[in-house]
Regions:
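Extracytoplasmic/secreted envelope proteins and their assembly/folding machinery
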Residues: 5-9, 22, 26, 56-63, ...
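Surface-exposed binding/hinge segments that line
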Residues: 41, 60, 76-131, 158-160
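Extracytoplasmic "Venus flytrap"
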Residues: 1-4, 46, 162
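N-terminal lobe/hinge region of extracytoplasmic solute-binding protein
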Residues: 1-33, 149
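Sec-exported extracytoplasmic/periplasmic mature domains
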Residues: 13, 17, 47, 64-71, ...
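A structural "hinge/loop" feature
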Residues: 1-2, 25-26, 52, 112-123
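Gly/Pro-rich hinge or "lid" segments in bacterial periplasmic/extracellular proteins
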Residues: 117-168
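Aromatic- and charge-enriched surface segment that lines or borders ligand/interaction sites
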Residues: 28-73, 102-104
Length: 168
């Protein structure tokens, strides 16, 4: 799963060929002195594979979706390092212009940037996710066939279930 996800999707950070953590969708980030808050600045010109803009609002949507119990996400527990608001949602926010993304943590977390490179934290396209037939009953319905909207270096162009996937 994750090996294929990194072909089709990108995160705020990634690991380079030397295993070093480097910005991917993020251009830069700032962390407060106490290690409790991060602000990421997104790169300009980011696009989904369908040509629509990818920005910090997509990251916010995706992280809230990951933490939402209704999605049944296997890795939702990883979001417990992030503070929550009174309504139970994650204490994260994209700027109105979609250029920056802010995160507040419950405590300093030495591996937080590593989480930003983990596939569960990769942004997903809200319009595709919520526009998929069967979305209400199957939160993963949007990406069950070749051609799903993605953000990574490759696009899934062929999918023979339980047999093979083709990426170009």
């Amino acid at each position: 799963g994750a090996c294929l996800a990194i072909l089709a999707f990108s995160g705020l950070f990634m690991y380079d060929e030397n295993g070093q953590l480097v910005p991917d969708l993020a251009e830069s980030y700032e962390m407060t002195e106490d290690g409790l808050s991060y602000t990421f600045t997104m790169k300009d010109g980011l696009k989904w594979s369908d040509g629509t803009e990818l920005n910090a609002k997509d990251v916010e949507y995706s992280w809230q979706r990951l933490a939402n119990p209704d999605t049944g996400a296997d890795y939702a527990y990883l979001t417990t390092v992030i503070a929550t608001k009174d309504d139970g949602t994650l204490d994260i926010e994209a700027s109105e212009d979609g250029k920056t993304f802010s995160v507040n943590l419950v405590a300093p977390c030495a591996y937080f940037l590593d989480l930003c490179a983990f596939p569960a934290f990769y942004p997903v396209p809200q319009a595709s996710v919520e526009g998929a037939d069967g979305y209400a009953d199957n939160p993963g319905a949007w990406c069950t066939e070749a051609g799903f909207v993605s953000s990574g270096p490759m696009v899934c162009t062929g999918w023979k279930h339980n047999e093979s996937m083709t990426y170009e």
